[in-house]
Amino acid sequence: MKTEDIRICVIGLGYVGLPLARLFSTKFPTVGFDMNQARVDALMSGHDATMEVDDTLLQEAISQNGFICTTDMEQIRSCNFYVVAVPTPVDRNNHPDLTPLLGASRTVGQVISRGDVVVYESTVYPGVTEEECLPVVEQVSGLKYNADFFAGYSPRAHQSRL
């Protein structure tokens, strides 16, 4: 994949995903995807209620960089570099709830194409990416990991106000 061809989708526009997507938008065409329509509407109006991204920076990303936020999977289909940044909560027994992560993997599986890359930014225990997430992407997409698409894991190094 050539640098000039990169089109990024960040799945999950929370305290990790939104700052990351905003920063990516300064260099690459970037789409932020979230399941929460009210959150997407607020972001597209230039306001981040969580205050992770300064409203001025968000408005600049939208107006000058073409950054968009959406709940529409058709708008992320043309992307070729997917970053999954969804929460990984724990239950009362401190067991991780992979539901959001597996849902995001299904979303990626519905839109990923040959040659694309998916990077997992969510905090998970060792083995989750290859043993839990990528099989979902393979099953939904019909593509094969490391043959048709590629993946990585980025341990989170959160820097607020990017």
Segments from the language model and where they lie:
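Short, intrinsically disordered, charge-balanced linker/junction segments flanking boundaries
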Residues: 160-162
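Conserved beta-strand segments of alpha/beta enzyme cores
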Residues: 29, 66-68, 144, 150
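Short acidic low-complexity segments
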Residues: 1, 63-79
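Rossmann-like NAD(P)(H) cofactor-binding subdomain of soluble oxidoreductases
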Residues: 90-157
